[in-house]
Amino acid sequence: MRLNKMINNPLLTVKNLNKFFNEQQVLHDISFSLQRGEILFLLGSSGCGKTTLLRAIAGFEQPSNGEIWLKERLIFGENFNLPTQQRHLGYVVQEGVLFPHLNVYRNIAYGLGNGKGKNSEEKTRIEQIMQLTGIFELADRFPHQLSGGQQQRVALARALAPNPELILLDEPFSALDEHLRQQIRQEMLQALRQSGASAIFVTHDRDESLRYADKIAIIQQGKILQIDTPRTLYWSPNHLETAKFMGESIVLPANLLDENTAQCQLGNIPIKNKSISQNQGRILLRPEQFSLFKTSENPTALFNGQIKQIEFKGKITSIQIEINGYAIWIENVISPDLSIGDNLPVYLHRKGLFYS
């Protein structure tokens, strides 16, 4: 995250936002803030409320109650709902939605309000945005002459044209094939960073959010479970459900021996939680915490294991090891000379997380 983001006044503030469709509540007391230049990913499964939240910020959906502030300006509150066109936000959806009768240049010019882009100031701005998004050579093409990735870049350029401080993107890469998705995603994120705009992405792709977000908001059933940096959500989540959602995990019943140690089927595991209410619960570990090699002078714990399966995958070898009757998979980049049935030490790196 860039240093210029760390300022006192957030760009966007959402306070106690609720939304009902008839009698069904789809947003539950949503509150968060977004700093200038920050990129936030709303992460959750289909139907969790993330798109509804994005549309509420844009003004396409009217919340039932709560407040939305853009800088120090109220854009939604009690008896007040600022129209979408007056919020000065950019919005990009899954498949770009370009005007088929306008070429790329005119589509971007439409983002400036008149669809012409004829005066020198507008021309300069459009050319800057086309350079930024890597579509300068496509200026005279029409949407049907563009690939899916090119259409998404044009849609982003159109959203950036009026120089909004906040861009909202609703799963903009989901309609692209995997190879193209990786390329376009990286290019669009780079363009957003260079523009200085803040952005909120809706996604169900965990790896995408871990890789590109400054912060991630985990949304389940219309509620934000936790909002934090990708590293914090992965290694120090507040809730077990968040931990499991953020990546592959090993979860075992456990008992506290003291405030720093829990006992589970694997053995005694050092833990790092400091606020624990009960002595019985579950411990969470990530598979990558286990290694057949001593990668630090003081590993967190040491176990005796036996190899049960070996799967060679080229540069990676997956090894299933049983520790005290519990089997875990370890991936090794370096493939040592090992055989099924071998007994060997297994090292644990980093502490576990205990949830009561």
Swiss-Prot record:
Catalytic reaction equation(s): Fe(3+)(out) + ATP + H2O = Fe(3+)(in) + ADP + phosphate + H(+)
Keyword field: ATP-binding, Cell inner membrane, Cell membrane, Ion transport, Iron, Iron transport, Membrane, Nucleotide-binding, Translocase, Transport
Recorded GO MF terms: ABC-type ferric iron transporter activity; ATP binding; ATP hydrolysis activity; transmembrane transporter activity
Record-linked InterPro entries: AAA+_ATPase, ABC_SmlMolc_Importer, ABC_transporter-like_ATP-bd, ABC_transporter-like_CS, ABC_transpr_FbpC, Mo/tungstate-bd_C_term_dom, P-loop_NTPase
Domain of life: Bacteria
GO BP of this protein: transmembrane transport
Topological type in the membrane: Peripheral membrane protein
This protein's GO CC annotations: plasma membrane
Enzyme Commission no: 7.2.2.7
Impact when changing residue 350 to K: In strain: NTHi TN106
Keyword flag Translocase: yes
Keyword Translocase listed: yes
Domain ABC transporter: 12-246
Compartments reported by the entry: Cell inner membrane
PROSITE patterns in the cross-refs: ABC_TRANSPORTER_1, ABC_TRANSPORTER_2, FBPC
Its job: Part of the ABC transporter complex FbpABC involved in Fe(3+) ions import. Responsible for energy coupling to the transport system.
Assembly and oligomerization: The complex is composed of two ATP-binding proteins (FbpC), two transmembrane proteins (FbpB) and a solute-binding protein (FbpA).
Protein name as catalogued: Fe(3+) ions import ATP-binding protein FbpC 2
Gene name in the database record: fbpC2
